[in-house]
């Protein structure tokens, strides 16, 4: 197997080095053995199976919690409609701007759909079904600030999911004194993407007791809380600047596009005009 093929293989596995005793016990797996981690769910192949799976989850939880379906932003319109029809309470659309610690560079840079058009397409898909406002829409991918969040809500999302932003607040990819990225994972800080190896230099994506010591959970929690609070305050500030008292009142009419491309993707007027490029 070539090194490239081996790398792809590893990205489809939960490596045995990460399956320590307490992980194995919680997941009912043998310790230290590589486990399949396929890109798709192996027990369903299409929308009918998805509906069955949603109902199984709903029964297992006695209907006490909403069931969400997370989709990679590709065929957004069709996929959102399928998820909603299958009975999802929440649809999460994860765009190509989302970060990941275990994916090939070609996939990161050249697959998927950006966040802005994915929100708009998902919104219109739910609206076509008469389910906009009934099925919740969560935007994910590239949400790094309160401004990003406010724009996503204005475009039609009910909420935003945060991933990499919170990890960075935890110290992900940061050149901390205890870590030597070059010698430990062979890359410089900021270019890590070695989550799947279990060798996280900052102690986040690892089960190695020595590496785990590099992350202070209490300090990390404080940094994440500060990050989320700052995002919330920034979104609230922008909302108030529009004369509104609730972020749920944000709407597309609150925005204009600064580029022709943004106008076409967001379906909002180009600044200084009433023209929505690509849709008029």
Identify what each model region corresponds to.
Residues 19-27:
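ATP-dependent carboxylate/acyl-activation modules
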Residues 11-14:
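Short, glycine/charged-enriched hinge/interface segments at domain edges or termini
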Residues 1-5, 9:
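Single conserved hydrophobic/aromatic residue that forms the stacking wall/gate
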Residues 31-35:
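Short glycine/proline-rich turn/loop motifs
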Residues 27-30, 97:
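Active-site-adjacent bridging/hinge elements
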Residues 36-212:
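Glycine-rich phosphate/ribose-binding loops and adjacent secondary-structure elements
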Residues 208-280:
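C-terminal extensions of enzymes
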Residues 4-5, 88, 157, 262:
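Long alpha-helical scaffolds
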């Amino acid at each position: 197997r070539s090194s490239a093929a081996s790398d792809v293989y590893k990205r489809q596995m939960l490596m045995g080095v990460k399956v320590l005793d307490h992980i194995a016990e919680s997941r009912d797996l043998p310790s230290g053995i590589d486990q399949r981690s396929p890109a798709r769910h192996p027990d369903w192949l299409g929308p009918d199976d998805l509906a069955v799976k949603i109902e199984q989850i709903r029964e297992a939880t006695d209907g006490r919690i909403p069931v969400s379906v997370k989709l990679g932003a590709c065929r957004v319109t069709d996929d959102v409609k399928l998820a909603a029809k299958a009975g999802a309470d929440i649809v999460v659309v994860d765009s190509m701007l989302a970060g990941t610690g275990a994916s090939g560079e070609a996939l990161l840079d050249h697959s998927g759909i950006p966040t802005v058009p994915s929100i708009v397409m998902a919104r219109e898909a739910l609206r076509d079904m008469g389910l906009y406002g009934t099925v919740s829409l969560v935007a994910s991918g590239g949400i790094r600030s309160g401004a990003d969040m406010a724009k996503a809500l204005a475009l039609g999302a009910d909420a935003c999911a945060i991933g990499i932003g919170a990890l960075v607040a935890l110290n992900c990819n940061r050149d901390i004194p205890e870590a030597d990225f070059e010698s430990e994972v062979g890359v410089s800080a900021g270019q890590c993407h070695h989550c799947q190896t279990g060798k996280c230099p900052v102690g986040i994506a690892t089960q190695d007791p020595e590496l785990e010591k590099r992350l202070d959970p209490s300090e990390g929690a404080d940094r994440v809380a500060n990050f989320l609070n700052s995002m919330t305050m920034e979104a609230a500030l922008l909302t108030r600047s529009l004369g509104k008292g609730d972020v749920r009142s944000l709407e597309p009419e609150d925005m204009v596009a600064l580029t022709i491309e943004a106008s076409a993707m967001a379906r909002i007027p180009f600044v200084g005009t009433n023209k929505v490029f690509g849709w008029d």
